Amino acid sequence: MTVRFHAAALAVTMATALAHVPGAMANTAAPSVEELIALALDRSPSLEAVEARLAAAREMVAPAGALPNPMAETILQNIGLDDYTVGSVDMSMLSIEVRQDLLWPGKRTAARDRATAQAEVEAARLELARRTLTAQVRVTYARLYAADRERQTLVAADELLDMLAETVAARYAAGESEQEAVIKAQLEGSRVAEQLDDLLAERSRMVASLNRLLDQPGGAPLGEVAQLPPATFPEGSWEVLAESNGPDVAVAARAVEEAARRLEVARLEAKPNLSAGAGLGYRGDLDPALILRFGVEIPFWREEKQKPAIRAAERELAMAEAELRDAVAVARAEAARLVAEREQADRQLLRYREAIVPQTSAAVDAARASYLAGRGDFSTVIENFELWLEARAELARRESDRFAVWAQLEALVAPAPAPEGDAE
């Protein structure tokens, strides 16, 4: 095989290795992450379900404190079984009555308060769902950024591979290199194409995951994520912020309030209900009768009905309080984890930007120069080239990791929005 043929074959390999990778991405920019978040918050079916549950809970506040419907009754009061005595016997009458069951004072207010507390739990769950969805979009966006930066590095590696191919061809043409170097250069081009193929497949999976959050077709394309927005971390203790602003803590705190209201309702259920009624009695030719009724419920089965319900409500309140303490502990632990990950990300970013990335570039240049001068081995060139690729891909991943930490922290410690209807 001639030297010219080897050089030509190597050039063709370098030029076509990446061209056979499927799923090439159009040169379009992806929407900003905030645009995608707005789209997700507007379209998400899971969020819509939580919103519907909150609306349903709010609709139940007014009915919770409503009185029972009144009862209309018609009564025939006849003396004797043989004759119709209405109009002829004083105590005989045909009456129409309206009776209204009345709740013990405080029961209606307690029931409304409990329903309001249940709605507040659902409102806190809605805020949790919104924050979770927002964090998911941001984290996925950050991973896509890392994938797109790595893709750019792999595509740019084609130019470096061309340069290495020229170096190998020059040495081989001069009889200063073995065919092994030519094959290794070709192999490296194929391996870069393999990495790019895997990367694009992984990117497609991430885009499909993002499309699910946006409630759009899984195969809907997404342009290149060219950059991440700045991540501004809050000042002060993240653990304190997580304890006061954490959405899971808010849900647990609202659950404690709801459990306390439920206990109050259970205790009031031990009080007797009342009833009142009024009616008129028709007595034929005799004067009509005025009927007034007032009744008091006798809580005869209190030991078997109301008191067990009170004890159960007390246990449920204790459970809710324990779950609140656990939610606070989880929030503090999550904040501590994010502190450690943020510090790690900052250190590693500094290390990659100021040391590893420039060092790998210098190593590739030095290895190529040594090989061209006949002082080095081509395996060293390939090894340094792979380090160069990995360093740039890892730098993008470290940037992605730092942004993901910020996204999770925002979901954990961002101030809760003002309640609906509050005016500044």
Question: Where does each model-flagged region fall?
Answer:
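Amphipathic alpha-helical coiled-coil segments
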Residues: 49-61, 129, 133-154, 163-170, ...
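A glycine-/polar-enriched beta->alpha junction
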Residues: 38-48, 55-70, 85-88, 96-113, ...
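Periplasmic alpha-helical coiled-coil/stalk elements that build and connect Gram-negative outer-membrane
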Residues: 2, 31, 129-244, 338-341, ...
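Bacterial Sec-pathway N-terminal export signals of envelope proteins
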Residues: 23-76, 101-102, 110, 116, ...
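Bacterial N-terminal signal peptides
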Residues: 9-20
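Transmembrane beta-barrel strands of outer-membrane/channel proteins
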Residues: 72-78, 276-282
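Hydrophobic, lipid-facing positions within transmembrane beta-strands of outer-membrane proteins
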Residues: 92-98, 238, 274, 278, ...
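Acidic, low-complexity, intrinsically disordered peripheral segments
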Residues: 25-30, 392-424
